[in-house]
């Protein structure tokens, strides 16, 4: 939906020159006033505070957004805001990248994470750079020491490890 659109039939590129709404199979909606969108490659460059909204609860907003729907990648420059309404958290910053398929991303330059999952308390985290990644929730069983076999580690399907980056030394966390 748009009131003004310039479309090049040779390059399959639509130039967005007014308020525009692009819908992909009822699962992703793009709202923008300025930029371009290629109907063949599903790549777009969105300007002037645009928004990408997914039906799964994810919303990406920024001054300039490069978005590749095919590989599920978004890069934001200027006033980034990534809202995850399913997990009830918002990621803010000046620059960032999001990978939809792997459910991870990062934000830098005035990076802040707000967790609003608890209705009585908000948790704020601020750092130079914040990385976000989704880890599956796992339950563990405590076993008696003598019941663990020597080769039980080798039989594990997937190693249970978490990587921690200690490069960034200044971090603040506070709640409201």
Predicted feature locations:
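Mature-chain termini and adjacent capping regions
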Residues: 1-176
